[in-house]
Design a protein with these regions (language model features):
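N-terminal glycine-rich phosphate-binding loop for ADP-containing cofactors
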Residues: 1-259
Length: 259
């Protein structure tokens, strides 16, 4: 990975920061300065991207359909293939830790919890969202997972619907862009182009699309906001998730690009 996120703390000296950037470039990395927050720039943005993907699967899409749509868009790997590669038990441990830290907030189980409870941690166990043959990393759609997902939907009273490839891409990427706008507004990232560098060199975003923030400008920030507002209206449960970041709304209204 070429990306190097350099975290700027409240007491980080300017010369230390400058030296870190120089060293990063010297060893062939693409350094990007980040402020302090949970997940920094890249992983913090990845979370709502994954939530949007999980919303799609819960509503009727399959993991392989979501992966295919995003890979056809140009992503190096879809979110469910990435999850199997990284290990589903990592996210499971984080979710359990956060639930323990906030006992007053009721924990809402997700489909990935059911997979982990069944010992499906991803490639390391030969099965996760997909199943894998010994010595082969090629994902294979598993009917067992399809049944787990179907049972999870039925328990929640969800009638599955169809999604187009375009809508899958829009929902996942607009969630990514919205979090990027929050990161800019909070000063975690200094520039929109810094966010693009993070995703181009660390998260498999297609180079010819210029990064998520650049892509949003190409689509039109007004169009991004209008789509997000529609998603919020379509599901009361997801309305808070699709609340437009103030900075994104401001630039969509003014027509000025995010900088």
């Amino acid at each position: 990975m070429q990306l190097l996120e350099i975290v700027r703390g409240a007491k980080t000296a300017k010369d230390v920061l400058a030296t870190s950037i120089q060293i990063g470039r010297k060893i062939g990395k693409k350094p990007v300065v980040s402020g302090v927050c949970d997940g920094f720039i890249g992983n913090r943005m990845l979370y709502p991207y994954r939530v949007a993907a999980d919303q799609l699967v819960l509503a009727g899409a399959s993991p392989s359909q979501v992966d295919k749509a995003l890979e056809n868009f140009g992503m190096a790997m879809g979110p469910y293939r990435v999850g199997d590669l990284a290990g589903l038990d990592i996210g499971w441990a984080i979710r359990k830790r956060k639930a323990a830290e906030n006992p007053s907030v009721p924990y809402e189980p997700v489909i990935a919890d059911k997979l982990c409870e069944a010992g499906r941690y991803g490639q390391k166990t030969g099965m996760g969202w997909y199943k894998y043959e010994a010595g082969n990393r090629q994902p294979i759609v598993d009917p067992v997972v399809e049944q787990i997902i179907d049972d999870f939907r039925k328990a929640k009273g969800i009638e599955p619907r169809q999604f187009s490839e375009a809508e899958i891409v829009q929902r996942c990427l607009y969630a990514l862009v919205n979090e990027g706008a929050k990161i800019l507004e909070e000063g975690i990232a200094l520039r929109a182009s810094d966010i693009d560098v993070v995703y181009l060199y660390g998260y498999g975003f297609p180079a010819y699309r210029g990064g998520p923030m650049n892509y949003a400008q190409q689509v039109g920030l007004f169009n991004v906001v209008r789509s997000m507002q529609r998603y919020a209206r379509e599901s009361a449960d997801a309305a808070a998730f699709w609340q437009v970041a103030p900075l994104l709304a401001k630039h969509a209204e003014s027509g000025e690009p995010l900088k």
